[in-house]
Amino acid sequence: MTFVMKLPFVDTVVDDSLANTFVNGKKLGYEFQIRLSYYRGHYLSCIEDLTIMVDGEKVEANDINFCLNGKEFTIGQIPYLISEFWNCNEAATIKVYLPGGLEEGKHHIDVTLLLRNAYMFIPGNTEKHNYAVLDSCGSKTLTLR
């Protein structure tokens, strides 16, 4: 895999976006928003890696839903979303299933977000992929009120 660029146009983790998620009055998890830290949008199928860590603990992929354009997807669906476009000025919501949610206070969120730049073919690359990868990773401490 070839890494070409990291262009931090915006913070990946959106300020003041952390909240617990309630379903039928029960706290079933939490959510926060992320943005592409890049000047172009991407199709969701171009996401090579989306990993979330909260307070130093990795969130299992099966517990994460990715929400964009009024739709909600599992991490396993992302490689097949060839027609779902993520505009660079839109925030996506990450929903995490965690019965009881998070406690109020500060929580450190680390997002690993690597995207394949489908328009940046790397000739001669014999590794897994022949496309440059955009590093849109980010981390931030948010306060849950």
Regions found by a protein language model. Name each.
Residues 1-145:
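Terminal leader/tail segments of proteins
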